[in-house]
Amino acid sequence: MDLMYVSTRNANEKVTASQAILKGLADQGGLFVPTKIPALELDWDQLKEMSYQETAYEVMKLFLTDFTEEELKNCIKNAYDEKFDTEEIAPLRKADGAYFLELFHGSTIAFKDMALSILPHLMITSARKNQIKNEIVILTATSGDTGKAALAGFAGVEGTKIVVFYPKNGVSPIQEKQMITQKGDNTCVIGIHGNFDQAQTGVKTMFSDKVLAEEMNAAGYQFSSANSINIGRLVPQIVYYVYAYAKLLKQGAIKKGEEINIDVPTGNFGNILAAFYAKNMGLPVGKLICASNDNKVLYDFFETGVYDKNRDFILTTSPSMDILISSNLERLIYRICGNDAEKNVKLMQELKEEGKYEITAEMKEALSGFYGNYCTEEETAATIKRIYEQDGYVIDTHTAVAAGVYDKYRKETGDDKVTVIASTASPFKFTRAVMTAIDPKYADMEDFALVDELSALAKVKVPNAIEEIRTAPVKHDIQCEVDGMQAEVKKFLGI
């Protein structure tokens, strides 16, 4: 019997995994969630001997039950190959009393590669399974990392086109250069004069525009999403938490069944939600530590039970977390209100109309497995400097937010469980912020000179993703206002 996916906003909308991957977003703006969380089938003695690819199969087959073994193994083989610069795919590095799970060894040096290298293969396979003849148009909003990882994943993939919107002044110079130099005739990159939340709202609006959908269909196109709202992004992310636990076991850092904490720098809530799903599958997890930057809407939510986006949007040195509407949180809300779509819709309606909602005491009780805290800009910079001076290990700004929050958590609770920190981007992606945190003397250096300095300092070679863009020509220079997004998509598609 296939595991089905249901919309968080409509109990009657049930689809298979492949249909959920193709649709991306459910009708009425809902998100697809599995009707139940499957339990891990293998024991840890087996899992600890497995490669990343083998672990991926064992986890993903439980969620993508309408894929054949051959289909799923092919997707995995095509995703986790030499695009990653280490055979381990996601190595663990011990520093500062924790284990950093390095999720940045893929082609765009950010954790998004872990899911976005497999999503195109899942999507093309899903299209074949469902006899889809239309060309699939991936529509994505990015706060910096998703965009490039999605572009790299879909560039040149037959039967697809991809359009990425990013906030023109809301990403790092290296993030922007990575996107606007992207090769591939099926790619389009557009800078909007607005912030990430506006880009994400614009994309969601296009998804739910019935008239646009009809025009697209008539021209032989249909939309899907590469954002973390797509279940095809979420499922591959569960894998690396299972893999990390198995590796800790193999190294003798933990005993079988021993609980670990997982600490995740959080913006759109997808990465920590994957850890929550892993815990519900039977992964022994104590606390899920949700780390925010100055845009601390999630910290306030865990503290008070009130989600309130009515606040200033702050641009920080950890831009992938500069988010006030945390999309994937809806999947957790749906779960803690007893999988009740009506209750969830009411809360989401309040968010849309008033910019806030409050959960019940009973729902808040269901969040006791989470701990939320945040780091200011100063604390983030101080954490980068401290860990470099203490361990010779250089982390990026997002990872530093998580490491800083972990430091607060330990001091507050005295909890000394083994902790895995999701290291979500290479420091080379945020070179200026990282280097000036270590020493202000770097403030006036040119971007690529800083890259070489960081390489010498960290004793790590410059990643290919950075070398490639040093001299790459700009291929995309389109900009638009927030209300001009749909017109740009139509122009690219020739509708």
PLM-predicted stretches and their roles:
Residues M1-I495:
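PLP-dependent amino-acid enzyme catalytic core
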